[in-house]
């Protein structure tokens, strides 16, 4: 029986894409994931993740990566949880090899509801099991987590080559906030790599617009 794991990387940052990773393997080969040291990507260094990524590509029967742009995130008409479920479905339906069982790291406080959302969108029959911290419980979800994280890390490096050093991209990072302010101050807008609906970006935009209005009023 083929089993799949699904996880994401980059849900919280104000910069960069949300990345969905899907991994598929025959249930009898799960042991091979353990043998190479697959575990939750958050417990691994970037170097360890890169090494495991290469090994995973050889071991897995199939895998798929989906990038969700900041524009898609900003223009969504529903919650982040629903967007995530929707994109999980797109990724799962894009697999060459369809699994009979799917393990998902639940973004919803109600894992059963999250599983139902995914099952409803599948174009094939499969059992969907959604759990919190599934990436720490199931090796196949850990594999998906590693694929998503490595892909996002690579994307972030490409963005840094183009836009400069913006830190981790997380709202709590002082370097990220500094970069957002400097960029907006210089160009009067954010580049397409920024999630404009995130509070950090909105506050910067509001502050600069307010200052501009005050300046315009003064100059009149």
From Swiss-Prot:
<keyword id="KW-0255">Endonuclease</keyword>
<dbReference type="InterPro" id="IPR012337">
    <property type="entry name" value="RNaseH-like_sf"/>
</dbReference>
<dbReference type="GO" id="GO:0032299">
    <property type="term" value="C:ribonuclease H2 complex"/>
</dbReference>
<dbReference type="InterPro" id="IPR024567">
    <property type="entry name" value="RNase_HII/HIII_dom"/>
</dbReference>
<feature type="binding site">
    <location>
        <position position="8"/>
    </location>
    <ligand>
        <name>a divalent metal cation</name>
    </ligand>
</feature>
<dbReference type="Pfam" id="PF01351">
    <property type="entry name" value="RNase_HII"/>
</dbReference>
<keyword id="KW-0963">Cytoplasm</keyword>
<feature type="domain" description="RNase H type-2">
    <location>
        <begin position="1"/>
        <end position="210"/>
    </location>
</feature>
<feature type="binding site">
    <location>
        <position position="7"/>
    </location>
    <ligand>
        <name>a divalent metal cation</name>
    </ligand>
</feature>
<dbReference type="GO" id="GO:0030145">
    <property type="term" value="F:manganese ion binding"/>
</dbReference>
<dbReference type="GO" id="GO:0006298">
    <property type="term" value="P:mismatch repair"/>
</dbReference>
<keyword id="KW-0540">Nuclease</keyword>
<dbReference type="GO" id="GO:0003723">
    <property type="term" value="F:RNA binding"/>
</dbReference>
<keyword id="KW-0479">Metal-binding</keyword>
<keyword id="KW-0378">Hydrolase</keyword>
<dbReference type="InterPro" id="IPR004649">
    <property type="entry name" value="RNase_H2_suA"/>
</dbReference>
<dbReference type="GO" id="GO:0005737">
    <property type="term" value="C:cytoplasm"/>
</dbReference>
<comment type="function">
    <text>Endonuclease that specifically degrades the RNA of RNA-DNA hybrids.</text>
</comment>
<dbReference type="InterPro" id="IPR001352">
    <property type="entry name" value="RNase_HII/HIII"/>
</dbReference>
<dbReference type="GO" id="GO:0043137">
    <property type="term" value="P:DNA replication, removal of RNA primer"/>
</dbReference>
<keyword id="KW-0464">Manganese</keyword>
<protein>
    <recommendedName>
        <fullName>Ribonuclease HII</fullName>
        <ecNumber>3.1.26.4</ecNumber>
    </recommendedName>
</protein>
<dbReference type="InterPro" id="IPR020787">
    <property type="entry name" value="RNase_HII_arc"/>
</dbReference>
<dbReference type="InterPro" id="IPR036397">
    <property type="entry name" value="RNaseH_sf"/>
</dbReference>
<dbReference type="GO" id="GO:0004523">
    <property type="term" value="F:RNA-DNA hybrid ribonuclease activity"/>
</dbReference>
<comment type="similarity">
    <text>Belongs to the RNase HII family.</text>
</comment>
<feature type="binding site">
    <location>
        <position position="105"/>
    </location>
    <ligand>
        <name>a divalent metal cation</name>
    </ligand>
</feature>
């Amino acid at each position: 029986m083929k089993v799949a794991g699904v996880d994401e990387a980059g849900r919280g940052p104000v910069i960069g894409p949300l990345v969905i990773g899907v991994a598929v393997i025959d249930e009898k080969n799960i042991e091979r994931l353990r043998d190479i040291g697959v575990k939750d990507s958050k417990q691994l260094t970037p170097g360890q993740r890169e090494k495991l990524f290469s090994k995973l590509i050889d071991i897995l029967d199939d895998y798929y990566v989906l990038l969700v742009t900041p524009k898609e995130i900003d223009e969504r008409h529903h919650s982040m949880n629903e967007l995530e479920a929707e994109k999980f479905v797109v990724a799962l339906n894009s697999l060459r090899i369809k699994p009979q069982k799917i393990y998902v790291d639940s973004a919803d406080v109600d894992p059963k509801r999250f599983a139902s959302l995914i099952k409803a969108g599948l174009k094939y029959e499969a059992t969907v099991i959604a759990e919190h911290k599934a990436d720490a419980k199931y090796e196949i979800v850990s594999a998906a987590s590693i694929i998503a994280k490595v892909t996002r890390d690579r994307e972030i490096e490409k963005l840094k080559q183009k836009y400069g050093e913006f830190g981790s991209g997380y709202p709590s990072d002082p370097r990220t906030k500094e970069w957002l302010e400097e960029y907006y101050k210089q160009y009067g807008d954010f580049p397409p790599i920024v999630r404009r609906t995130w509070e950090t970006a909105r506050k910067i935009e509001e502050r600069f617009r307010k200052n501009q209005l005050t300046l315009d009023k003064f100059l009149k």
